[in-house]
Amino acid sequence: MKIFLKTEDEIGLMREANQLVGKTLAELARHIKPGVTTLQLDKIAEAFIRDHGAVPTFKGFPNPYGGPFPASICTSVNDVVVHGIPNSETVLQEGDIISIDCGTLLNGFCGDSCYTFCVGEVSEEKKQLLRTTKEALYKGIENAVAGRHLGDISSAVQEHCEAQGYGIVRELTGHGIGHEMHEDPQVPNYGRRGNGVMLKASMCIAIEPMVTMGKRDIWLDKDRWTIRTRDGKPAAHFEHTVAVRKGKAEILSSFEEVQQIEGKQY
């Protein structure tokens, strides 16, 4: 395992890449409504990213099980946990939830963040899933502090979600991030406090709870990218890129503009 600590200048560049991801998600928030296809959202995202001098890192991302990822964002609707491929057939419906995962490469550094959106008015059951998953993200971030361990992040996420009866997907994890989208270490969403790598200041990691309304079991669709819940129940996914600091983590990505556009939905 090779973990790269970042300089302050490098963290500054990562902050810029991640802020662009936040702005891209906000731009998409303006267009998420019933009748819109996920392919339309992908085209909006790619144009926005490129217009701001960056490259969408997901496009062409290699897959050990099949071909490279064909789009600029992942659009995961309802029972899709992650890696949903934008297409013209998936039309958003009133009451859907959609997780949009977005990555950028700007000035040699990567940004990565995900947000689960409501399409129109959604059920209270789905709102509670989203609320809990987002809370779990911030529980994890509270533990991304120098001197603690990766297991402290993982345990905080797991305990918060499982206490409310939700499933934590175990096959998928967060990750280190920097020049590359996926660097060491992996950041699981389950674990034991005090276990795992000790966190050091200037480590940069993506923390991303992937939480299911039902059981945690998943399956890989025939496109070799789309991962769904095995029981067909909805899933939510929130992600921030953070810099480990002494005392308190620094969140490099941002949901601020998204939440201003969305208002208080849940």
Residue ranges and their predicted role:
Residues 1-266:
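Active-site neighborhoods and metal-handling regions in enzymes and metal-associated proteins
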